[in-house]
């Protein structure tokens, strides 16, 4: 039996035993929850952008919003970019309010107050965090015959959602979620990535908790 076949057989067996796995945890602290949902009011979910080189991933922000609306279509989640354009420049990194006490000062700007009224904005949810990839292990070699080898790496996701009540101008809750997972890339001629859905697990975890706060159905 030639070496090519033995190596292919060994890695094929490893592929059959390998699945990406994810572990996640969620912590919640909320108060003054709406008892019957938010009615015809709206909510906006924004990623924190502390500087030009740091921002919560826009795709994660969109994922959380989609999770909420897909489970309760009665909740109106304003698109992040739509909101930022509507209230420009008041929510740019240098001008965005950092604390609920800044809401009163923000609403003193007539264009902002009028826009918030038109949007029927009840809750603003800040998302802060990121998903990072750690150093991997393993090796892989490729030639005209294909690729052989095995690689692995991990992802860690940590996010915090802070809920502001625009009417009461107060913080009414926080949700923290963390997730970690191991991804793999076995290769028998063709590399086949087996990706751990770490960011997706974090999105589902934080989205479920926000649904419990916002929706009358949960």
Spans of features found by a protein language model:
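A structural "domain/chain start" motif
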Residues: 21-102, 214-218
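C-terminal/domain-edge helix-coil "capping" segments
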Residues: 21-41, 50, 118-119, 131-134, ...
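Sec-dependent bacterial lipoprotein signal peptides
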Residues: 1-19
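Stable alpha-helical elements in mature extracytoplasmic
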Residues: 56, 60, 64, 108-112, ...
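Surface-exposed short loop/turn segments
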Residues: 96-167
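Sequence contexts marking disulfide-bonded cysteines in secreted/extracellular proteins
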Residues: 22, 64, 141-148, 204
């Amino acid at each position: 039996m030639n070496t090519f076949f033995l190596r292919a057989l060994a890695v094929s067996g490893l592929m059959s035993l390998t699945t990406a796995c994810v572990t996640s945890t969620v912590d919640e602290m909320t108060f003054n929850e709406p008892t019957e949902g938010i009615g015809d009011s709206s909510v906006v979910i924004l990623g924190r952008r502390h500087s030009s080189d740091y921002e919560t991933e826009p795709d994660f922000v969109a994922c959380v919003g989609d999770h909420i609306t897909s489970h309760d279509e009665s909740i109106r989640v304003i698109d992040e970019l739509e909101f930022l354009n509507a209230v420009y420049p008041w929510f740019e990194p240098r001008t965005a309010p950092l604390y609920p006490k800044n809401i009163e000062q923000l609403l003193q700007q007539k264009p902002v107050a009028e826009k918030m009224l038109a949007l029927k904005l009840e809750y603003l949810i800040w998302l802060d965090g990121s998903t990072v990839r750690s150093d991997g292990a393993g090796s892989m070699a490729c030639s005209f015959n294909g690729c052989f080898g095995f690689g692995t790496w991990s992802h860690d996701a940590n996010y915090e959602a802070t809920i502001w009540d625009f009417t009461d101008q107060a913080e009414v809750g926080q949700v923290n979620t963390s997730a970690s997972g191991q991804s793999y890339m076995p290769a028998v001629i063709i590399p086949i990535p087996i990706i751990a859905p770490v960011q997706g697990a974090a999105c589902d975890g934080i989205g479920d908790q926000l649904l419990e706060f916002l929706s009358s159905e949960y």
